[in-house]
Design a protein with these regions (language model features):
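Generic amphipathic alpha-helical segments used as scaffolds and interaction surfaces in large
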Residues: 92-95, 188, 192, 248
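Short, well-ordered beta-strand segments enriched in hydrophobic/aromatic residues
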Residues: 243-251
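Noncatalytic carbohydrate-binding groove/subsite architecture in carbohydrate-active enzymes
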Residues: 4-158, 217-229
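Aromatic/acidic polysaccharide-binding cleft in carbohydrate-active enzymes
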Residues: 69, 120-238, 242
Length: 259
């Protein structure tokens, strides 16, 4: 229930006491940023953190600004929809909302550019992923949900978006690793499985430590589903130091395959 100005002043105060313990592993100071599209929070927090007497080289006393955005495929927060029982409309609703991540990064990134044109401050998307209704019969407080190819595609398009904004997005954490929301691993007693989302992360690992290559797709079909206009294909491309090029191409169509 804080105003952004009040929070930012508290942040400025307490970050003063957080010092590096060793130069080889400097502490990264992450300021609490916006939830989804709350650009007023971003504006006011940055305005306050950069206000005099902040030194110019302190870049707002932060190394990163956090951002949360969950894909809620259902009609509302109170009706999120099932993770496994969904229609074609539900497929496209999830992907359309996942693609909104691109708009959010551009919106908050543009505000950051006003204060930090050199992009020293990372946008830290520290909570993202699908948020469905909990699996029937499980403790609702544990947020346990199943995982399908729809979740895999949401992960794929989101990681492609992060790749394309790697000059500003410096960290991104799916929520969460095991047994909660869009997990990469599900367990029950001594048993465990790797989810479709896990396999997306495994396939995308070749982008790590690589350099982004500019890429665009032409002649791609657009799928119109209600309020969402969704490209049938979406991609990101990188090149490793040895010249190996990695292309991750996501097919968003629920019905059409592409050669």
């Amino acid at each position: 229930n804080m105003t952004p100005e009040y929070y930012a002043n508290l942040y400025r105060r307490y970050q003063t006491y957080v010092r590096h313990y060793q130069d080889s592993a400097p502490i990264q100071k992450i300021c609490g940023g916006p939830n989804a599209g709350d650009d007023n929070w971003t504006k006011k927090v940055l305005e306050t953190c950069f206000a005099s007497p902040a030194p110019e080289d302190a870049h707002g006393f932060m190394d990163g600004l956090s951002m949360h955005y969950y894909t809620v495929p259902g009609e509302s927060w109170m009706n999120k929809g099932s993770a496994t029982e969904f229609t074609t409309d539900g497929w496209y609703q999830a992907l359309g909302k996942a693609l909104h991540m691109d708009d959010l990064i551009k919106k908050h990134g543009a505000i950051l550019d006003q204060y930090d044109p050199e992009k020293k401050i990372g946008l830290m998307v520290d909570e993202w992923g699908n948020w469905h209704e909990v699996e029937p019969g499980t403790n609702p407080g544990f947020l346990y949900q199943q995982n399908t190819m729809r979740d895999a595609l949401v992960a794929a398009v989101t990681l492609n978006i992060f790749n394309k904004h790697c000059d500003r997005v410096k960290m991104a954490c799916i929520a969460q690793l095991i047994n909660v929301l869009q997990s990469v691993i599900l367990t029950e007693g001594e048993k465990m499985i790797l989810t479709p989302t896990y396999h997306i992360f495994h396939m995308y690992k070749y982008h790590q430590d690589a350099e982004l290559l500019r890429s665009d797709l032409t002649g791609v079909d657009t799928i119109q589903n209600g309020e969402f206009s969704i490209p049938a294909l979406q991609e990101s491309v990188s090149v490793q130091k040895d010249g190996t090029i990695t292309v991750t191409l996501a097919n968003l169509s629920a019905e059409q395959s592409y050669p």
